[in-house]
Structures are given as C-alpha cells and as structure tokens.
Amino acid sequence: MNLVLLGNGFDLSLGLPTSYIDFLDTMDFILASESDSYKTVADIWCSKQLRKRNKNIANAYDKYKAIYESIPFPEGVIAAIKSTLEKNSWYRYLTGSFNKDVGWIDFEQEIQSVMDSFSFVLNSCESQPSINISGHFQKDFYIVHSFNFLLECEKQEKSNTFEKIYSVRREFTIERPLGSGHRVIDKEKIIAYLYDELRSFTSLLQKYLDVFIDTPFAEAVKQKMIGSHKLFGYTERVITLNYTHSFECLYPSIDVIHLHGEVGKKIILGIPSDVCDNDEFPNTDFIMFKKYFQRLVYGTDKEYLYTLLEELQNSPGKISLAVMGHSLDVSDRDIIVELFNVSDSITILYHCQSALETYVRNLVRIFGKRGLDELRATKDLKFCPLSKAQLFTTEQEMETFFDVLEQN
C-alpha cells in the first residue's frame, strides 16, 4: 500500500497563501478597513499595501487573479468576520504580540505559552479575589493582561517594596463559601472562556480557508488553470493535517483522511500532548486545548484510528510512506511515530537544504539519534529532493521511483 502524509507545505507549493501569517495579515486588513462591502477576494488582495507586506498573497493574487475576481463572497461573510475580529481576545493577543513570518507550529507554541502563563498565575492566586503581579514574571502578566480579565491596579507599599494588585472582573469570580460574600477567582470559568474564544478564532480560520482558499482553488482546477499534477497519482491513501481540500481537487479518486478536521466541518487547533498526559492522575485543567482531546471530541480521527491503522497493521503487503510539506515537528509526534512504525519504507520529500536540515533535527527530537539510525536501517528511511521526484501514475512507475531511491 502506498501512503502519503501531507502538511501545509503542499498547499504552499500550489501557490496558496495558507500559512498563519497569510491568514493573520488578511484579518488585519479586513479589521483596519472602514468598509465591509468587499465583493470578492480580489477586492481585498489587490491592495498594494497588503501585497507589499505579504509575498505569498502577492504571488497568489498574480497567479489566480482571474478566479479571485470572478467568485463573489457569500452574503455577509466579511461583515461577520469583522464582527468576530473586533471581539475576539485570541486575535487581539496574537496580532499585538508579534509581527513576523511564522507558521502553524509557532501558533501552537503561542497557545502553549498562554496556557503556561495562565496555569502559573491562576494556581498561585487560588482562593484569592485578585492577582498580585509582583510575584510573577513580566511575560506571564503581559499574557494574562492581554485577555481582559483584569481591572484596576492598586499599588500598595509593603516592606519597602511595591506590590501591584489587580482585581479580576466580577464575572470571572465566584462566591466561596456560598453566602459568605467572599469572592475568589473562578479558574474553571476563565479557562472555559479562553477555550470558547479559541473556538471562535478557529471559526475565523474556517471562513478564511473556505472563501479565500478552497472555493477559488476548486474553480481554478475546474477551469484547468492548474497544470497536470501527477506526483501522487498512484497513491492509495492520504493522511493530511491540512484543513483544505486542495488535494481532493487534484486527485478526486484518492481516499483522503483529514486528521485535524476540514473546511466545512470541525477543525482541530491546539497544542500537542506531553509526558504529563500519561501520569496516573494527570492535570486536566487545560485538556480541551490538547489536539488529542479535540480529535476525540470532534471525531476527526475515527477513520484513522479504527479503519486505516488496523488495515495497515494487518496488511500482508509492503507499506510505503511518502511525506510532503509536513515539518515533522514534535507537536505531531504521536501521528508520526504511529505511521513510521507501520511503514516498511519511508521517503521524505524536501524542497531545499534548510528544509532537509529541519526534518532531520525534528526526527532526532522525536526518535533520538539511535532511533533515527534504526529507522534508516530497518524502515528504509530516505530523503529525496522534490526536483528528483518522478511524476508516477502507475504502480510500476512508483516502484521504479523507490528503486531509484534505494540506489542513492
């Protein structure tokens, strides 16, 4: 069986602006604009300022301009996006925290930073009605303060030092004990609010990928604006961590599993599991932010867990896995380990030397040096530049492709 594991690099290779910064730059433009009457993608991405700021958007606009001009937005979608942007605390935090070219893994790290800071601050202020900032790192205070939980600051001099005491908004406190009139910080309510806001932010991403990416690309394929794309023509199964349907547009007959959800359905946006999740009594305060929790709740991994893995484990034939456009970051360690373990041969496609170095570094982080050496010896692990990847459309061509790799 021939498998492919896809990441966001696949969409980027098609000229689609699907990186985190592409999404955020577009959201920034919409919010800053005085108008919400844009009719098409072209009306927004034609902005010289936006195209100068973001090369992915500029290149996509040049490549798919005719499509972007021809497809109207659904009624009211830009107004709905703008309304959510104005209120969403995650968008406000992220757009105010940095302005650099980052990817999805970096966004997961931002979520992790927020979880770490809230965990530290909330646990240290348990049973208190307010937060004493003097005992916390500046980073933790900055993050908590960014989410609008805190009210006025009172400066109190104590032992020749100044303490900064911040009250917490009343709706995020609870009376304990009941009837006492004494209110303390309601940790559960704060965490629930953070998660609800993250899901609202996720809905923005859904809308972006739907109207700015999926719909125009499907039309571009329909109008044959995309050249012949046969790299994975003889693939039997695809496991993608992308939300888009670009692969299905190019290969409609191939079965695709969207492990992290897909446009038009629930999508997963969170942080990876860690060793603490395997403790006998793990802390579950922030479990809803974990990707494995969301996969279980939203059922995005059902086909993968209960159909594909069982099929692979019981397969009598050779299993060949190709990886394209996925960084192999430790954040997806559980998926990578499972797929690598059931595969007989693994080919990782890379587009440049720095990407190759990143893949090797990440694999060492996941498997360790000895584990990586063992993979190379027992799993026939190879790295192949995309420039040498043949466009195979038959089983024989694919076997020839892997035979050539074995000689390199």
Residue ranges and their predicted role:
Residues 19, 270-274, 352:
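Intrinsic-disorder/low-complexity, polar/charged segments
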Residues 1-14, 20-26, 30, 35-52, ...:
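SIR2/sirtuin-family catalytic core signature
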Residues 296-307, 326-330:
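A general structural motif
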Residues 225-232, 307-315:
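Short boundary motifs at domain starts and secondary-structure transition points
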Residues 40-301:
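Extended, H/D-rich, highly charged conserved domains that either
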